Each structure stands twice: as C-alpha cells, then as structure tokens.
Amino acid sequence: MIIRGKQLVALLLFIILPTCILAQSKRQQNNDKELLAKAIDYYQGTKYHEALLFFEQLNSIYVLNPRFKAYMAVCYYHDNDFKKTTETLDTLLQSLTVFAPREQAVYYFINAESHFQEQNYKQALTNFEQGLPLSDNKEKGYIYYRIGFCHLFNEEWQLALNAFELSIKSYNDNNLPNIHEQQTLNMILGCQEKLKPTTEITPDTLPQTPKSEGSKQSQSDTEEKKEK
C-alpha cells in the first residue's frame, strides 16, 4: 500500500497530536498545582488580595472544593467585597458542617458581618446566632453586641436589650477590654426608654382651665334669673 503525502501528514498528526495534548495537559496541571500552592501560601500569610487572584483564576478552570471556596469568601471579606462574600457563603455554609467548629465559626461570622454591612439585618442575625455556639467565649461579647444591633434595627427592643446586656456580661466574665462598652450602655438606656409604658391621657385627667371672675359672675346672674 502506497501512502501519499497528505495521508502521511494525517497519519503523523494522528500519532503525534495526542502525545502533544497529553504533554500540554500535564504541564497545565503542574502549573495549576503551583498556582494553588501560591494561593494557599498567600492565604496563610494573610495576603488575602493576592491569594484571591490565584483562587479566582483556578475557579474559572475547575470546580473548587468547599474549603477553597470558603477561603475565597474570607478573601472577599478582607477585600471589603461583602456582596461576593455572602454570595459565596450563603449557598456553602451547609456543606461546611464537617469542618472543625472553630473554622465553621469563622465562616458564620464573616457571612453575618457581611450581611450586617449590607444592612440585611435579618440574615445577619441568623448567621450570628448560628455561629455563636461554635465561637470561643472570648468572641461572644462582640457577637452579642452585633446581635443587639440587629434586633435594634428591627425595632425589637426587648431582644436588643437582652443581647446588649449579655454582651456586657460576656466581656466582664472573660475579663476582656470592651471598647464598645460606653456605646453598649447607651444602647441599653435607649432600649429601656423605648420599653417604658406610655401613659394614656383621658379627658378626666386633663387639667381643668380655671374660670375667670367674669364668667363666674355671669353664671351666678343666670342662676338668679332662673330662680325668679
């Protein structure tokens, strides 16, 4: 069988091309492994913006696992991109329950804080409360402080008062400095003021306007005429 020129080229491509693609694929995989290693290294070194650039690059190629997506959310949070933080974690938190409680607490907190900054106080409250039992005692004073404001902005005065009082107690119980103490005390007073019962003013309790001497005399004259 005689192999003509075009057939020979096609045959060579058939043999060589898969090998080239495989080699290129391996090089790409090695490059991506290096990118991931750099991303993790930057993340652990708290260089969140730099880490995020690598994570986003990898996320455009692969489906990242939940932990790396959670790392991305932390990076978004430290970049003050609260919208992307919540977009990432809202759908992810339920799949993070296999992680250690302390790690889960971090993700609940940054999602709650991001919702708070976005003025979505209802969802912020939910995440603060979910993360509270997973958090270290030293962190609970601030979380109660934030919970108090969530209730405050929803005009839930009694719940806000309870949370602010728990915040003060938590800081005191753990002997921690409380930079929010004065503001918390002010909020407690404000809630107590809102909870004071309002006194209804009825007609019987209204102050009576004293009659003038002229009107008294006029009334007396009228009564005398009636008697006559």
Where are the regions a protein language model picked out?
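Terminal, low-structured helical/coil segments at or just beyond the last alpha-helical repeat
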Residues: 161, 166-228
